[in-house]
């Protein structure tokens, strides 16, 4: 027989303490959704079952005890940290679910310069870890647009990819080791070693599991030298997307690794670069790192783009200004809410993966449907 809502709350309070179990209705409503439902959220409309409680977890041991209890009584759990997700994965679609909030597990455990690794609990905001590293001259190399909001556990659980992935890779390329708690409360740890010599890489069972298989409590990621003084910015306007895709392919095939490589169509370019796009497509690159490598990368980009006479370079300062305003923090989220209320319009980003041979066809098919 399943436990009642009240019984679930009472037993959770016994496990973690009453101060860590939140049952305020406003909080429960907010925690029944993620940013996929930002339009109804802005209008105060919540149609999903609200959770029985939100638990502010404080340690791996607490996560283990809570999951053991929930597993025994078949209670649905929704792991949550920064809550910046936009895919509906944080919704409490099952009655009397419990939201497992790890944002209070927010300690940076170790910054290991010799081994070029940083270890943090699941609730450490990426921006906090990044700032701590930058003070020492290092970086994670991971920079999704949600950097001011996202936290380390969620980034790994959702297989996050950042804006510098062409150079540094995605989160799955950065994770060295981790700690996680399975559904029955068993704590498992994957060691921080550079390579496994045999068997499947079990990190990839956990990375991207979306909270369905386990609760990630601790993460160790690679770190890199941070040298923003060497950043080189390149921006071009061009007539068509096909040319842009060809340029991107040539740069990658030649072995260059800019940290940023972006192509905007005319509509998107006009939205982001009204001051110079002039109704054309926009191609953007950034080279960074060791000054010799950055210089060689920049020269390679310029040489390849020069093979396409239709491309017109724009002032690098324009691209640098764009770069410095990429991320979405609380201020931009608040401003977006005001704009949605005012206009009734909103947008989402959809990520698509495709090979060089099909990516332009995918683009044309999608944009023709939209238009």
Predicted features by range, described:
Residues 75-76, 139, 257, 311:
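Residue-level detector of anion-binding/catalytic polar loops
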Residues 1-68, 86-116, 266-275, 321-348:
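N-terminal flexible segment immediately upstream of the FAD-binding catalytic core
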Residues 106-262:
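FAD-binding subdomain of flavoenzyme oxidoreductases
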Residues 22-38, 243-371:
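C-terminal substrate-recognition/cap domain of FAD-linked oxidoreductases
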Residues 12, 37, 43-77, 117, ...:
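Soluble FAD-dependent oxygen oxidases
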């Amino acid at each position: 027989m399943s436990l009642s809502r009240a019984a679930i709350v009472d037993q959770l309070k016994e496990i973690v303490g009453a101060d860590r179990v939140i049952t305020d209705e406003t909080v429960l409503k907010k925690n029944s959704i993620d940013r996929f439902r930002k339009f109804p959220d802005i209008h105060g409309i919540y149609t999903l079952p609200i959770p029985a409680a939100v638990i502010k977890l404080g340690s791996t041991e607490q996560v283990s005890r809570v999951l053991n209890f929930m597993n025994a009584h078949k209670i649905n759990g929704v792991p949550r940290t920064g809550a910046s997700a936009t895919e509906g994965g944080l919704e409490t679609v099952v009655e009397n679910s419990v939201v497992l909030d790890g944002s209070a597990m927010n300690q940076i455990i170790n910054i290991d310069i010799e081994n070029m690794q940083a270890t943090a609990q699941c609730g450490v905001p990426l921006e906090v870890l990044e700032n701590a590293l930058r003070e020492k001259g290092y970086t994670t190399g991971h920079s999704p647009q949600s950097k001011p909001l996202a936290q380390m556990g969620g980034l790994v659980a959702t297989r996050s990819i950042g804006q510098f992935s062409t150079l540094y890779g995605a989160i799955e390329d950065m994770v060295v080791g981790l700690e996680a708690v399975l559904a029955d409360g068993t704590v498992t740890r994957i060691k921080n070693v550079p390579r496994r010599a045999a068997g499947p890489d079990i990190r990839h069972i956990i990375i991207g599991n979306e909270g369905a298989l386990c609760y990630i409590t601790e993460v160790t990621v690679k770190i890199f030298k941070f040298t923003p003084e060497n950043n080189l910015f390149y921006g071009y306007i061009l007539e068509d997307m096909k040319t842009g895709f060809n340029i991107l392919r040539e740069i990658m095939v030649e072995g260059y690794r800019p940290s940023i490589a972006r192509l905007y169509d005319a509509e998107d370019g006009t939205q982001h670069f009204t001051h110079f796009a002039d109704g054309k497509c926009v191609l953007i690159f950034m080279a960074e790192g060791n000054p010799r490598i950055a210089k060689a990368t920049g020269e390679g980009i310029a040489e390849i783009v020069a093979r396409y006479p239709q491309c017109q370079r724009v002032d690098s300062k324009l691209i640098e200004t764009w770069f410095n305003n990429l991320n979405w923090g609380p201020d931009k989220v608040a401003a977006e809410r005001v704009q949605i209320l005012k206009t009734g319009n909103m947008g989402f980003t959809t990520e698509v993966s495709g090979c060089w041979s099909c990516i332009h066809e995918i683009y044309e098919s999608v944009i023709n449907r939209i238009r």
